[in-house]
Amino acid sequence: MATAIGLAIYFAERNRGAYHNLFMTFSQKPEFVSLRGETLLQKIKYVERTEWGMNTNFQAAFERVLETALDHDVLPEEMPKALIVVSDMEIDRCGDRNWMFYDHMKEKYEYCGYQLPNIIFWNVDSRNDIFHADSRRKGVQLYSGQSVTTFQNLLNNIDSTPVKSMEKVIESERYACVRTGNAA
């Protein structure tokens, strides 16, 4: 939970425009919450006291993002690039197995002149192998762990597919010795 709280604060402070200082609750009826507090400790205490429904409704989450955009006349370039779900991944099923809700939301966003944000599942617990999408699902990414490298990879690949994100990591300088067989 500490990781999720820290990341909620981190991303809320960096959101732009109508989404600045906002984070979304995990809930059947997700809501944006405005980050409050002057110091980091005050912000942590505030987030800890936030109501969490402890279940998920991703379609409703995407609808909240779109409603906020429409209510505040958000320009397309100011829309969030992704919904980042920081969790132990023991969360409700994402709509149906075929992700029909995601396809429906994509159409709804496009009708309103926006691109649907990616959804990034970030398993910060790493104790299970639950996957909420397969590697071919465009607009969905899967991350696991709490390392700085994981965080950097997420930020560098925020609008990518799972396979493209993986390829970018594998093709990075860090793994050159593995690719060439020149391990020290």
Question: Over which residues does each language-model region extend?
Answer:
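Acidic, glycine-rich A-domain
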Residues: 1-184
